[in-house]
């Protein structure tokens, strides 16, 4: 087990290194000068040269890449060209809201997807299954931003249950959670649709296993057999999707 984990970590490190090299090369190939972008088109050449030296843009590309890797290793992500502030500080400031929002959305999507997948798998080919699959297809097709606007229009503007924007801070946890509810729902429903479809497929695959037939032969109903014996064996692909969704939700919330 330890050897497998070490191999996976080495594979992850190599993948990240290759991805970083490709991204760095693409950024270098793209036209434009960050220093001239920050100073404007009317900047004097000596001013541009001074800023390039300050940002480290006057050194060879390979040296800049190695400096960037070294900075990443110690948590120095550089300076934002747009906001002219350290990137690490910007990420840290946003994590106070983005991380709870991502966890909130992931909890909602899991709470919605698991029961829906269990119902659909237990009633495969029947009305509940068709209804759940239709709802998940709609959830996948509806854009997040459009659904978010509908939520704001209904619950914030028409009903006045939530605020249309802003975040009050964590001094009042209940007010903070309330402010995150509409964004969390808008992020959670499309992810719940994907998760429900994946879990339904995994549960249907489990239905053909011998231990499910044995559980049914002992008198368990299909929902009972799925809940007691099928869910744990169907969680491997589901946990993979959950990890990917958390990364997607956190990255989207930070951006």
How would you describe each model-predicted region?
Residues 16-66, 159-179:
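Hydrophobic alpha-helical transmembrane segments of membrane transport/permease proteins
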Residues 58-114:
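An internal, D/E-rich "acidic patch" concept
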Residues 22-29, 59, 70, 134-165, ...:
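Membrane-water interface segments at the C-terminal ends of transmembrane alpha-helices
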Residues 2-4, 16, 92-130, 144, ...:
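Alpha-helical transmembrane segments of integral membrane proteins
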Residues 26-30, 38, 42-43, 72-73, ...:
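Hydrophobic aliphatic residues
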Residues 3, 40, 50-53, 67, ...:
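Short amphipathic alpha-helical coupling elements at transmembrane boundaries
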Residues 6-12:
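N-terminal signal-anchor/signal peptide hydrophobic helix marking the start
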